[in-house]
């Protein structure tokens, strides 16, 4: 786990983006950046945001060699042929496209079912909120995993694959959504007959993802799957 300036590097790449329910926001660079943007848009916080940094907080200037390297990269980018044809993006196999299609179908039907129902979207204990939060994210992460795998097939590397990380996020969303639908049945908010198509989608998606991405479950997400390292980080900050 890499930490820079108190932030866990890459933690937001494989999270569920449900910041209101996350215990890692104080160590997330993306959360801090979004909070800063929102503060800039709030006139009540303008004076704080615009205040100059303290001398000890000001970052040191980049070394000369780094500035020269950046200048060279910018020059190369400007000199590149603007009309150069980009390689055609490879399409996933038909079987993988079927997973995308099923995720799309689940999203569409879950969205239609949720419409008109009142619930707090920020309450992670509310099964309605859980289904609402993950029905789109499952679709998005399935899409990312499937298309990332196409690009990774020709790469021989021991580095953890983005496709596995994205598939893991989708699988986590599937697991939580499955439990939420069953919770609604227990509460009497939906009948067994009504919930059956949604459960069938989730079971099919989960089994398909685990077949195509057998290493997804064991993918280690920065911070989120490293409790010992996070505990050490918190202890160091408190000490």
For the regions a protein language model found, what residue spans apply to each?
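Charge-dense, extended regions
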Residues: 179-239
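Short, solvent-exposed segments of well-ordered alpha helices
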Residues: 6-9, 13-16, 60, 97, ...
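Conserved binding-pocket/active-site segment within a compact domain
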Residues: 124-204
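Charged linear interaction tracts used for macromolecular binding and regulation
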Residues: 63-161
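N-terminal cysteine/histidine-rich coordination modules
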Residues: 1-64
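Generic structural signal for hydrophobic core residues of well-folded globular domains
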Residues: 31, 73, 181-184
